[in-house]
Amino acid sequence: MTTFQAAQAQNSAPNPYHEVEGVWGQIGRDWGATSAVDIARDGSGNIWVAERCGANGCQGHDDVNSVFLLKPSGELVKSFGAGTILQPHGIHADVDGGVWVTDTGRKEGKGYQVHKFNMDGEIVMTIGTPGGTGNGPDSFNGPSDIHVAPSGDIFIAVGHLGRGDDNRITKFSSDGKFIKAWGKTGKGIDEFHDPHALAMDSQGILYVGDRYNNRIQLYDQDGKYIATWTQFGRPSGLYIDGNDILYCADSESNRRRNPGWKRGIRIGGIKDGGWVQVFIPDTELLPDGSGTSGAEGIAAARGSVYGAQVGNRMLRKYVRR
């Protein structure tokens, strides 16, 4: 099968979902750009989302909350985070009730960090030098996403937008101590260009959305390479549910960046080899748009799929027909 034929196969998978009409999710004001959505681990089906203060960044909006907890109905439960994050990008809700948010914004002495909040909105841990750059153990040149393993070990994807030569995965202990890092800028195995999203399956395998390379790379938790998957398109966001179903948001494919592929949400069972079984196309698509459209962040619970959108500045909900 050629690359073009493979793309057409993934583009033509059935779509058993429809969008909930209108702006979904009440946060008390207009939505800003958002690429960060996750599901609470307490069985409630509640949704965590971090958005960019009604704009595409929180700088100059220090009195505006950026982290929200929503019920499946869209009703607001709580919000916090004002003045702490310049550009919320990735979010992860851990099994102990912690909520982690990555900051890809930067100014002197602030940003390029990962913050852990408790349920009261208090910062209880921060990883990364404020405003730091470079590739040192605690310096992040754009931390795109965060995932915490059941063991408590912390994985951070570094290199938002493929900046410089700092494209890597870093691993920290549960108390924030550096353990190791792997990867460098490039197109080969163990190389990344804009590692944009992280997820983990029930076997503890780490999935890295290597966006600019149009692939997902799979690793064990020691950084040993396992496989490369290209069938999910150009991955901006990843989510794996409790049944090992992988959800991938492709917000950037076009004829220049990923020829033959369409933007949208691809869904496939990991236990079935990761073949795409569902494709929710991006209805806002400009076929050759150079920016981003549709879902960039992705999560799912109780039969619904949630897509966090940067371009349209909203959280979109999809339900089964």
Tell where the protein language model's regions lie, with residue ranges.
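Eukaryotic scaffold repeat domains enriched in small/polar residues
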Residues: 4-321
